[in-house]
């Protein structure tokens, strides 16, 4: 068998696609790379699990579950937990634990439900996270632009937004369902790929239906948020710098993924020289997002940090008092009456 996977021009869905694993001259380095990635992905999964548990554990009039921002974040966090866990247990394992390649790869030379589900759910989660960043950015923009009506607005649109987040990513995965998913050599390990059954509906092209609106809307929402903040007095504006950095970082990371998908859909044949860079961005941008988002949210939100780690603080009970005022509004989505109370407490 060849160390390169050669796909015949005409092959049936059930035909085996065998290959021989490449020799790894740096086995320990590959294993170390896996352990490093498994460590930070595991940390992300644990932190996101703790955030989701805290969001749904707390009850009361001003619980996290009444907060549209936290509900949106919890939906994305569930996807992040799944993505991190499956990458640690399968995706990164088969790439970097190179001694396993000769033993494991033959199980996937023929069609496998495991690789099909892995590949399908991976792209479902990518599409979900692209859309969720649009929703979260819109949520934060409305906090600044419509602070008084923001909470009522999201009471009306939260359910349709959540349904859309879970339904729309199916538009990316339908071609995978009818396509042949296979494994191919990746360095001295192997990874999962597919041969599209519908040629025009490749994955990068289908992702564009989310990525292009994402690029446009994220820019619009960010500029609108900046404009809204400039209308605030200096004291409140300075209190929002950390949140703007947080929002901007999430947006930039998601837009990098969108740019990479646009490249693979339209520009790969014209700019082959930057293909390695685009592959690097596609593979790593969400790793940064997985780790950054829970850590930044926990560090930024003092009350959430206390509830997660059961820390004692000066603030009694469950609430968001003594926070920077717009940070309270953007993170807690409190009612206008609670906003006035918080303004008095600051």
UniProtKB/Swiss-Prot annotation:
Q: Does the keyword Membrane apply?
A: yes
Give the domain of life: Eukaryota
Q: How does the protein's chain sit in the membrane according to the entry? A: Multi-pass membrane protein
Q: Where in the cell is it found?
A: Membrane
GO BP of this protein: sensory perception of chemical stimulus
GO CC entries: membrane
Please name the Pfam families in this protein's record.
Srg (PF02118)
Q: Where are the transmembrane segments?
A: 27-47, 69-89, 106-128, 157-177, 212-232, 254-274, 279-299
MF terms in GO:
transmembrane signaling receptor activity
Q: Does the keyword Zinc apply?
A: no
* InterPro entries documented for this protein: 7TM_GPCR_serpentine_rcpt_Srg, Nematode_SR-like
Record key words, sorted: Membrane, Transmembrane, Transmembrane helix
Intrachain S-S bonds: none
PANTHER family, per the entry: SERPENTINE RECEPTOR CLASS GAMMA-RELATED
Q: Which family does it belong to?
A: Belongs to the nematode receptor-like protein srg family.
Protein name as catalogued: Serpentine receptor class gamma-20
Q: Which organism is it from?
A: Caenorhabditis elegans
